[in-house]
């Protein structure tokens, strides 16, 4: 497709879907066969479950997009969030909750539609949270 479309898809997801809770936009950019690696589910309903679950766990979450990089068939969004999660994403060995707040979202696209989504968290941030006293 185009770099512009790839950028638009990522910007819509981060800024509109997560940032403004506009979940109704998901079918506009998600292919029916899209694989969400976080849930193992496919299609727009998979991303809807992922996004709504994230936002419900962090009421009033604020999203800040650091940067978006794109090619014709991929987009990479570096972003962070602020808020107070209801449930942590895990616990360290000493019982500290783990809340990685800096994320890299990786989208693979085909014909301008999202077909594969993976998210990666900041390892340094996780390590600091796990080792905190």
Regions found by a protein language model. Give the residues of each.
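C-terminal and inter-domain tail/linker signature
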Residues: 1-133
């Amino acid at each position: 497709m185009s770099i512009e479309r790839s950028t638009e898809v990522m910007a819509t997801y981060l800024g509109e879907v997560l940032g403004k809770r506009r979940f109704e936009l998901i079918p506009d950019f998600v292919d029916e066969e899209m694989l969400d690696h976080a849930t193992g589910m496919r299609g727009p309903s998979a991303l809807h479950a992922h996004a709504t679950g994230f936002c419900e766990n962090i009421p009033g979450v604020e999203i800040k997009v650091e940067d978006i990089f794109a090619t014709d068939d991929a987009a990479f969004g570096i972003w962070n969030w602020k808020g107070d999660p209801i449930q942590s994403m895990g616990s360290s060995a000493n019982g500290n909750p783990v809340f990685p707040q800096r994320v890299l979202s990786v989208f693979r696209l085909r014909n301008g539609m999202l077909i594969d989504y993976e998210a990666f968290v900041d390892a340094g941030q996780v390590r600091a949270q796990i080792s905190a006293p």
